[in-house]
């Protein structure tokens, strides 16, 4: 069994007028599929997506149509650092407008949070 190394609390920055959605997925094509889901759910939505790979070089894949939101998503994903986690920042839409579209992406397994309120993520670390 992996050795438990502790718990880390990650503060997720959420600028005024922005919402964040954090979830889990299991496929390398997640970013492309989430991009399509968001852009078709709400015309005019602004967003940034980041996804942490779980193997290999453990890259962070990202995309979006707003540079500020892409940077926020990348930094939040990097801070969380857990494989298969995705972070989406949205503007000009609400989570209720996109959650069903996100949940219908076949590789999405779970939504952990969708909010504009202060948010922390608790990460358990092992070796």
Please give the residue ranges for each predicted region.
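N-terminal, charge-rich interaction modules
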Residues: 1-62
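Long, charge-patterned amphipathic alpha-helical coiled-coil/hairpin "stalk" segments used as oligomerization
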Residues: 59, 65-127
